[in-house]
Structure formats: structure tokens, C-alpha cells
């Protein structure tokens, strides 16, 4: 009996020494729109885990979807996937309830994937608020879009390397951003961004961010790309640059802090949206 108790005790001690598996956030969300009597209406809605989607009332023909990560932020090992489809002849604006915060990762890398599609004559505007990367955050982000030849697409992705107003900075960590955009079945835009290791040292280089800690990439695919180019360049000034070719307009801007970046983004987004403002949640 004594030897049996000792064996049980030893087994329990061994189990107690095993590391506890940390809980990770998982989420999947999908929205699809359809045209009903000239207005964009909900066709499909799916949400699972920490991924939530809310649909505020609008007073226009476009539908608006607000993406919510109910876990409150991301850390190593978290995984969220969003899918948004604008059906034929519809207009869909997708944004987020707040800035996505990516916290220090004790292990693993957070993953966020967005899969976008737009049907014939559709407009899809992907306008999430900024992603804030805290020190030692680790994030792998991917944006994929499959667009009909006659559709219009706007994508904005803004990043803050810490919050300057709070005295925070991302000095070390990992941020990988991958875009794959297909238009009419053809790959028209592909890019890879990688900030890894000594992030502050890397972004201080003149050829990278020259010490700026807020930056954004904007992509417009549509019939007005050439006409918009000089207007976008006038807004961006020395804080960014823009290029246009074959119906695609790419804009990159950077700033010293998040507030200064927003002062650039608001008029640029409005111009790309033919005068329509940014979603209201951006102003809250």
C-alpha cells in the first residue's frame, strides 16, 4: 500500500510540473451582401468565437459591417479570419469597432486573415481602424482579394508601432504583412512587409521609416485611379507618395504619431470614396 501511494504521489507531482496550456482566442466571421430593390442588403452572416459582426443602419445604398474582436486584443497564438463578399451590384463598407491591439507574445504568433471578394459592378471598401503593435508583439497578417473586372475596391491598412501619447514604443517584435489582390482573375498587386527583431533600429533607417512610428498603405482599384493621382499626391505632400498604373492606385504615408496619421488618412479616404467620409466609428 505504501509503495502504491508513493507511486500515485510521484505521478501527481510530475503532472503538476507540466506547463499549463494557455487559452488562445479563435474567431471566424463572414458577411455577404446582395442587391434588393436597388439597395445593398444582408445575404449571409456567420460569426464564431471571438469574431463578431454588427450591421448599423445606413441612410444610403451601401451596407456597413463593423468587425469586433471580443477578446479585446491579440497575442501570440491567437487566430482570427474575416470573410467579406460584396455581391453583384452592391456596395459594402467593412470597418472595425476600434483599433486592433496586439500585445506582447509570450510564445507563438497571432494570425489575422482577411478574404475579400467583389462581384460584377460591386464596390467593397475595406477600412479597418489602425493596428497597434506593442513591444514584443508578434503578428502575421494576410489580405487576399478576388475582384470582378467591373468592381471597385479600396483597402486601407494602418499601423502604429506603440502609442506615442502613452510613452509606448515597439522596440522588438515581429510584424509580417502579405497582400494578394486579384482583379478579373489576374494577380494585380502583391506585396510583403516584414519587420522582425530590432524593430526600432530597423525603422529608424532613412530608407525604411526614418524614425516615424505610424504608417499606412492604401490601395484603390477602379475607373478613377488616374484622375485621383494628382489630388492624392497634393494631400500626402512630403509625408507619403502615390503611384498609378493600369487602373491601380497605391498610396503610402507615414507620420510621427497616430493623430498625425489620421489627419492624412481622413481626406485621402474621403477622396477615394468620392467624397463620402470615413465610417462613423472612426470618429468615436
UniProtKB/Swiss-Prot annotation:
UniProt name for this protein: Urease accessory protein UreD
PANTHER family, sorted: UREASE ACCESSORY PROTEIN D
Region Disordered, annotated ranges: 1-28
Lineage, broadest ranks: Bacteria, Pseudomonadati, Pseudomonadota, Alphaproteobacteria, Hyphomicrobiales
Complex formation: UreD, UreF and UreG form a complex that acts as a GTP-hydrolysis-dependent molecular chaperone, activating the urease apoprotein by helping to assemble the nickel containing metallocenter of UreC. The UreE protein probably delivers the nickel.
Family: Belongs to the UreD family.
Superkingdom per UniProt: Bacteria
GO cellular component: cytoplasm
Function: Required for maturation of urease via the functional incorporation of the urease nickel metallocenter.
UniProtKB keywords: Chaperone, Cytoplasm, Nickel insertion
Pfam families per the UniProt record, alphabetical: UreD
Major place of residence: cytoplasm
Entry's localization field: Cytoplasm
GO function terms (MF aspect): nickel cation binding
